[in-house]
UniProtKB/Swiss-Prot annotation:
One of its GO terms (cellular component) is plasma membrane. Transport of potassium into the cell. Likely operates as a K(+):H(+) symporter. This is Probable potassium transport system protein Kup 1. Belongs to the HAK/KUP transporter (TC 2.A.72) family.
Length: 620
């Protein structure tokens, strides 16, 4: 396959995965701005003002902020809030801002889940609502059809999306071409609408109608939802294909369609009830509903896949308990399925569809999570500018300060929508933040307790003496600590009075980078008397595999026969205590999460018939 063919394939794939969310925004962005909870009169001045705001919002928040600036801040090729967090915490380790920035990154991850629940619901609803343009008699069927489409989407997740995924790119390319064509047809009828590119119209609208424009920002932000996906999906496709796709197809198609809808409103203000489908010729509405539904399903799939990816990163970075991770492709490391995440999302999405009933009602809930995440991305990347790129502080203040002011304006414009539905992403954000921070703090308390009770290895080795029997074979003790003796070894010695001929104290660690190559996977140290310390490293985008890591120990002259190797694990039971460290209810939550975590044998891919689990009880 030639380099050009590969590049074209990557470009089309990027269009299918990266741009689904932002690509379906024309379905509802202008409609909600003019006819949402804070309606704006459809006058020529207002249309020009809103179009100008949409244009400059897309240019500033997506083109300048993400495409030009933030996409430079990759973590060894990976993007997204957690990848950026890992990069920034590495840069600021030892600084006072370390923990506040860590908390900000966790908040961004928590807000992401609120967003990932709303996107499938609002996208598919807005597409199916096109049937109402055909005839109002179809209105009662909008919610049931949406529910069926979304149920089908979530049910096929466990089978993987590799085969269907090959269609995503061509379908989205067709979608963007149709968006552009519809826009051009309407612009030709009123070409003067292109004058709204002039920022004077946006400024004039803000000055003349400060309150109205403030409310408008809360809906205009819908035009850039999904903009952060350009950065999040960078690891899958690379910076270059995403940028080329944006400038060559996606950006022109989006802007042409928004200006086309604006041109339609200038000639027919009544079209505001659904300007997207009203710009479509009558004979084409039903096929367009079909294409729009396909596009919104693709947008939803991208968000669902992103939720799996963020969950895996959170598990690897110690923010979530172990979960079952299923690889749905033998070729692509990134194609995974996490059952718990999938069904949690499904329940939340269905509750939103049934509870809110329409895309207009859901639009009020959309925006807070997106603008919050965008604001945190700006703050984190400011530290990358200063500490990694070595920009002068004036340049950092000018670029990051300007972007942060824009983010803040949109964030506060969305905060006022709390009572109308904005409470939902905030509720999910608080819930997710509580879970993430409780797990992280709980694991920290456990490590401290284990460290306190740990016995130094040299003490144990001296205590062994010549009388302790040595069993044949190898014993691998999995431990979170990189020093001292794991509780499982002490229990084995205490109760069985024996130690294996070869003892390996293995620790699986997660690096601040997305991937660790096999050449750097393992480090083995000979401690003497048959004892070895093994450090196994994985990136936060990788899934641990302990037996595969043991195979790499041949480089250190150590070979492992799985049939002669036993794996010893500590099965820890946590007892909430009155000791300072965590609130009692959080201790109970941590204990509950531990009980429901995926067993270490499954998560680390250890053969279950070679495992010995020894129970220990710890107070936290």
């Amino acid at each position: 396959m030639s380099q050009n063919t590969k590049g074209a394939g990557l470009l089309i794939s990027a269009i299918g995965v990266v741009y689904g969310d932002i690509g379906t925004s024309p379905l509802y962005a202008l409609k909600e701005t003019f006819a949402g909870h804070h309606p704006i009169a459809v006058t020529p001045d207002n249309v020009f003002g809103v179009l100008s705001l949409v244009f400059w919002t897309v240019m500033l928040l997506v083109t300048v902020k993400y495409v030009i600036v933030i996409m430079r801040a990759d973590n060894h090729g990976e993007g997204g809030s957690l990848a950026l967090l890992a990069l920034v915490t590495e840069l600021t380790r030892g600084y006072r801002v370390y923990y506040p920035l860590m908390l900000l990154g966790v908040i961004a991850a928590a807000l992401f889940y609120g967003d990932s629940m709303i996107t499938p619901a609002i996208s598919v609803l807005s597409a199916v609502e096109g049937l109402e343009v055909v005839t109002p008699r179809l209105t009662p069927y909008v919610v049931p059809i949406t529910a069926v489409v979304l149920t089908g989407l979530f049910m096929i997740q466990k089978r993987g999306t590799g085969l269907v995924g090959k269609l995503f790119g061509p379908v989205m390319c067709l979608w963007f071409l149709v968006l552009a064509l519809l826009g051009i047809v309407n612009i030709v009828a009123a070409p003067h609408v292109l004058g709204a590119i002039n920022p004077i119209y946006a400024a004039d609208f803000i000055v003349k109608h400060p309150m109205m424009s403030f409310f408008a920002l809360g809906s205009i932000v819908l035009a850039v939802t999904g903009g952060e996906a350009l950065y999040t999906d960078m690891g899958h496709f690379g910076r270059f294909p995403i940028r080329v796709a944006w400038f060559a197809l996606v950006l022109p198609a989006l802007l042409l369609n928004y200006f086309g809808q604006g041109a339609l409103l200038l000639s027919d203000p009544s079209a505001i009830q659904n300007p997207f489908f009203r710009q479509v010729p009558e004979w084409m509405v039903v096929p367009m509903v079909g294409l729009a539904t396909c596009a919104t399903v693709i947008a939803s799939q991208a968000v669902i896949s992103g939720a799996y990816s963020v969950a895996r990163q959170a598990i690897q970075l110690g923010l979530l308990p172990r979960m079952t991770i299923v690889h749905t492709s033998g070729e692509e490391e990134g194609q995974i399925y996490i059952p718990f995440t999938n069904w949690t999302l499904y329940i939340a999405v269905m509750a939103l569809v049934i509870g809110f009933q329409s895309s207009s009602n859901l639009a009020a809930a959309y925006g807070i999570a997106v603008t919050g995440t965008m604001m945190i991305d700006t703050i984190l990347v400011a530290f990358v500018m200063a500490l990694m790129w070595r920009w002068h502080w004036i340049a950092v203040a000018a670029v990051a300060g300007t972007l942060l002011l824009v983010d803040l304006a949109f964030f506060f414009a969305n905060i006022i929508k709390v009572a109308q539905g904005g409470w939902f992403p905030l509720f999910i954000g608080v819930l997710s933040f509580t879970v993430l921070t409780t797990w992280r703090r709980g694991r920290e308390l456990v490590r401290n307790q284990v460290k306190k009770l740990a016995v130094p290895l040299d003490v144990v080795m001296r205590a062994l003496g010549p009388n302790v029997s040595r069993a044949r074979g190898t014993a691998v003790f999995l431990t979170a600590a990189t020093d001292g003796v794991p509780p499982a070894l002490l229990h084995n010695l205490k109760h069985n009075q024996t130690v294996h001929q070869r003892v390996v104290l293995a620790t699986v660690m997660t690096a601040d980078t997305p991937y660790v190559p096999d050449s750097e996977r393992v480090t083995m140290t000979d401690l003497g008397d048959g004892f070895h310390r093994l450090i196994i490293r994985y990136g936060f985008m990788q899934t641990p595999d302990v037996p595969a890591a043991l195979e790499l120990c041949k480089a250190f002259g150590q070979e492992f026969n799985m049939m002669a190797t036993s794996f010893f694990l500590s099965r820890e039971t946590y007892v909430p205590s009155l000791n300072p460290g965590m609130a009692h209810w959080r201790e109970r939550l941590f204990t509950f999460m531990t009980l429901n975590a995926t067993r270490a044998t499954i998560f680390f891919k250890i053969p279950t018939d070679r495992v010995v689990e020894l129970g220990t009880q710890l107070e936290i």
